[in-house]
Structures are given as structure tokens and as C-alpha cells.
Regions:
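Formylglycine-dependent sulfatase
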Residues: 1-167
Length: 167
């Protein structure tokens, strides 16, 4: 059983606004995200007043988890921006923006708000492994779930295992 969403149309031509539209189902301006979020330049973030799909599903008994790039504002640089937990995700493993310094052996991942430190491997594989661990070990098998997974790889600098690149 369940529902598989297979036909999403981007709400904007860039990263952060599209993510805001995906989570809220509303125009990104209304959700508070009007351009790509550059943490050093402004405090823009997904407004806490917006209801996300994760919040709606959580209220209806779903386990919710986010994996990968968030890029909707985070409490970095002493800011009080909301985290994925503030938008309905029970569990999250992700990035404020990029994996830094590269997709290989990244250092910027957070797990439920706590820095993880350097992880060996490539960010795409790390995110999938974490999501699979959550699916197989951390969630209640009898509970419906919503898993949101956003890869960082569409953004430079691109790095991937040689066996994938060679294909």
C-alpha cells in the first residue's frame, strides 16, 4: 500500500525556492524563500508559519525523516532559523547547504542538529546509507512513513566514485 508521488513540477528554477514549494505546496514567495539561500548574505528561511507535508503527515501518525541537502535555512552563524525538526521531521540527517569541502569525505553533515564530523565516502552514498539505516532499523515497521531525500550532487563541485563515473 501507500502513495508514490511521481510527477512533481518545480515551483521555481532554482534550488531553495523549489524545495520550499515541494514541502508546502505553496508559492515559494509565500513560504518565505524568494531566492537561493546564501547563509552568509541573509537570514531567509522557510517560515515556521508554513505547514509542510511532513507536519501534516506527522499529525496523522506518520514517522517522518529528511535526508540530504536542506538548503531552507538553518541555525548556523548564531541565527535562530528553524531546522527540519521544526518543520515536522522526527529524524533528519543532512546539510545546511553543501557537503564541504567536497562530495568526497564530507565534513558538514548534521544528524538531528549535531555535527557528525568527517565521513568517509561520497555524499550521495552516505545519504542513501543513512536513509536505509533509518528505514531498516530506526523506524517502527507498523507505522506509515514519509521519507524525504534530496541529493546534493546536482551542485558543484561534483564528485562520485570511479565505478559510477566510468559508466
Amino acid at each position: 500500500g501507500g502513495v508514490r508521488f511521481t510527477d512533481f513540477h518545480s515551483g521555481a528554477p532554482s534550488c531553495s525556492p523549489s524545495r520550499a514549494t515541494f514541502l508546502t505546496g505553496r508559492h515559494h514567495y509565500r513560504a518565505g524563500v524568494y531566492s537561493v539561500i546564501t547563509e552568509r548574505l541573509h537570514k531567509m528561511h522557510l517560515l515556521e508559519s508554513e505547514t509542510t507535508i511532513a507536519e501534516a503527515l506527522k499529525e496523522n501518525g506518520y514517522a517522518t525523516a529528511h535526508f540530504g541537502k536542506w538548503h531552507l535555512g538553518m541555525p548556523v552563524n548564531n541565527r535562530k532559523n528553524p531546522t527540519p525538526a521544526d518543520h515536522g521531521f522526527d529524524y533528519w540527517f543532512g546539510l545546511v547547504n553543501g557537503p564541504g569541502p567536497s562530495h568526497k569525505n564530507p565534513t558538514q553533515f548534521l544528524r538531528n542538529g549535531k555535527r557528525v564530523g568527517q565521513i568517509k565516502g561520497y555524499s550521495c552514498q552516505i545519504v542513501v546509507d543513512e536513509a536505509l539505516t533509518w528505514l531498516n532499523e530506526k523506524r517502527d515497521d507498523d507505522e506509515p512513513f514519509f521519507l524525504n531525500l534530496w541529493f546534493n550532487e546536482p551542485h558543484a563541485p561534483i564528485a562520485a566514485p570511479d565505478e559510477i563515473v566510468s559508466q
